[in-house]
């Protein structure tokens, strides 16, 4: 892995494969191209009713790329129901390099100056590859996901790759598709330009950001 750098990782994403590790302290990294892939259709993203009320109330200040490394570390930390993580130190470093190059981003939920939840992923043309999320208070990662989807819709993205299908993601409309179909969608997304900062860069969200996010999602459906 010593010669494998961020540019190599970008090439992997463009081919439809992504990195994983068995544990935080295991330095080995392997690449995955699942037979079935989890995706979240942006045009069919579902916001559960209770979550929509929460988002509309703007319980968190949403920041973009303000504390990327802290988000990755929080996602890599063990917690209730998660004793191990696939984010080892070589993978952590690769994502930091991608962030420096402008390809990896975080959506963060803040209460005052406390980071309480968020997610991060990789942006490449019209595709966004969601990597991991975390919450320190109720609904924080879910709110971050809603704001991510709104940002992707505004920026002209066509693919949100969730990697693996989970019951948690199913509530938002995620579904599983065969590898061949995934690669077709990926090829189309990579041929389309998109702008992750269409809703603005690293400035904190303004009042009404939740309503705007829900409006963008509704208009796309």
Curated annotation (Swiss-Prot):
Function: Functions in the N-end rule pathway of protein degradation where it conjugates Leu, Phe and, less efficiently, Met from aminoacyl-tRNAs to the N-termini of proteins containing an N-terminal arginine or lysine.
Catalytic activity from the UniProt record: N-terminal L-lysyl-[protein] + L-leucyl-tRNA(Leu) = N-terminal L-leucyl-L-lysyl-[protein] + tRNA(Leu) + H(+); N-terminal L-arginyl-[protein] + L-leucyl-tRNA(Leu) = N-terminal L-leucyl-L-arginyl-[protein] + tRNA(Leu) + H(+); L-phenylalanyl-tRNA(Phe) + an N-terminal L-alpha-aminoacyl-[protein] = an N-terminal L-phenylalanyl-L-alpha-aminoacyl-[protein] + tRNA(Phe)
GO terms classed as biological process: protein catabolic process
EC number: 2.3.2.6
NCBIfam families per the UniProt record, alphabetical: aat
UniProt subcellular location: Cytoplasm
Keyword Cytoplasm: yes
Phylogenetic classification of the source organism: Bacteria, Pseudomonadati, Pseudomonadota, Alphaproteobacteria, Caulobacterales
Coiled coil: none
InterPro entries associated with the record: Acyl_CoA_acyltransferase, Leu/Phe-tRNA_Trfase, Leu/Phe-tRNA_Trfase_C
Primary location group: cytoplasm
UniProt KW keywords: Acyltransferase, Cytoplasm, Transferase
A GO-annotated cellular component: cytoplasm
Domain of life: Bacteria
One Gene Ontology MF term: leucyl-tRNA--protein transferase activity
Cross-referenced Gene3D superfamilies: Leucyl/phenylalanyl-tRNA-protein transferase, C-terminal domain
Family of the protein in this entry: Belongs to the L/F-transferase family.
Broad class of enzyme this protein falls into: transferase
One Pfam family this sequence matches: Leu_Phe_trans
Protein name: Leucyl/phenylalanyl-tRNA--protein transferase
């Amino acid at each position: 892995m010593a010669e494998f750098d961020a540019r190599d990782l970008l090439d992997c994403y463009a081919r439809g494969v992504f990195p994983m590790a068995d544990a935080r302290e295991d330095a080995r990294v392997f690449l995955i191209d699942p037979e079935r892939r989890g995706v979240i259709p942006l045009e069919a993203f579902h916001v559960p009713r209770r979550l929509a009320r929460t988002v509309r109330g703007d319980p968190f200040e949403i920041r973009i790329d303000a504390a990327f490394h802290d988000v990755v570390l929080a996602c890599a930390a063990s917690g209730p129901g998660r004793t191990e993580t696939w984010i080892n130190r070589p993978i952590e470093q690769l994502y930091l390099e991608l962030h420096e190059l402008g390809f990896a981003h975080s959506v963060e939920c803040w209460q005052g100056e406390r980071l309480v939840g968020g997610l991060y992923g990789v942006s490449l043309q019209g595709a966004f590859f969601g990597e991991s999320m975390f919450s320190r208070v109720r609904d924080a990662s879910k709110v971050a996901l809603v704001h991510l989807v709104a940002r992707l819709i505004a920026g002209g993205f066509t693919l949100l790759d969730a990697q693996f299908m989970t019951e948690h993601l199913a509530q938002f409309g995620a579904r599983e598709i065969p590898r061949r179909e995934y690669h077709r969608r990926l090829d189309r997304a990579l041929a389309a330009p998109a702008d992750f900062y269409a809703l603005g860069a690293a400035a904190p969200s303004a009042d009404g950001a939740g309503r705007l996010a829900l409006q963008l999602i509704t208009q796309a459906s």
